[in-house]
């Protein structure tokens, strides 16, 4: 057979999902908080000015986000109530309605009715945060999105977990243990792969706020020469495939702990996963090594439990293929968030399997809302959102004359009253994340 990317295909390689040791794979929030607390205390004494400046940014953003969080909560309650009403059931009670007795000659329905509205499902949210080097420039904007969603969860009482996925080489030394056994023909898992639990609904309010403060300074330091990030939690590659296939076991653990029925899984990343591998025995080395899933064979992933299997097609995007695979074996909404520029919309649409001709409407929506929501990308919904104008500019240090407009109203000299009014409205509208995307996201959660 001929393959679109590799001309000679000699056979089919069937791979299975590995069984993860969650106790070794997940670094619990008590450990991550302890590490960041010790690191932050040192930063306060060594780089006090930089830390206080970052702390002021965090507190300012938290205050500004009240409007966004309140909007999210209101939308959630409305959509949840609408869903409950939609599932309402009206039935006869068996008791005569005395006010209808006079209609007995032409009306057969003389009984009182009762409408039953079923209890809403318990909701839960699991977030996966891309902790890769390519995220450094957009980590703070992504973190802000995440913080809004965390505060939303706290306000409406939704249990949540936030895991940063990392395969930094020192993880195996800092957090020792075997994550997954090297079983022949299983999807290969790097020995340094870990899920770092940064935030959890099981944190008390003070601990959660402190961790958010520490993390804001840490992420701000990725591109700020005045600060210094935590090297023990440095950015790594993009083990998104490994993260996606942990979802079934992580969700089972989460549902068991929180007793929730409906779970939404959110992947916050900046693009494609690294190339997947499978465990293959190398005779010359007498050892199992990870081998690329592409080459002279077509790979099929099989879930031993459900027996569901799917061919992995690189031409349709690695991330999309694995997300679509997992969506068939878990009972959850799988959602993706991506901060990107306008030029990346077409690229992301192609990764989503959308014909590039059809991106005309996406471009129009982007121009109008600075965001688009895509379906049919493996995810239940994939959200592409514009990078804030105040996000990291890699050329800032080369152009000292460039002005930063963070939290500033920019107007020209001698502006008219109407120009000042419009500038103020534009500034205030920018304080709130796009309502269209928020409404769609809340609709999925509710």
Model-inferred region functions:
Residues 1, 5, 12-446:
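Acidic, glycine-rich A-domain
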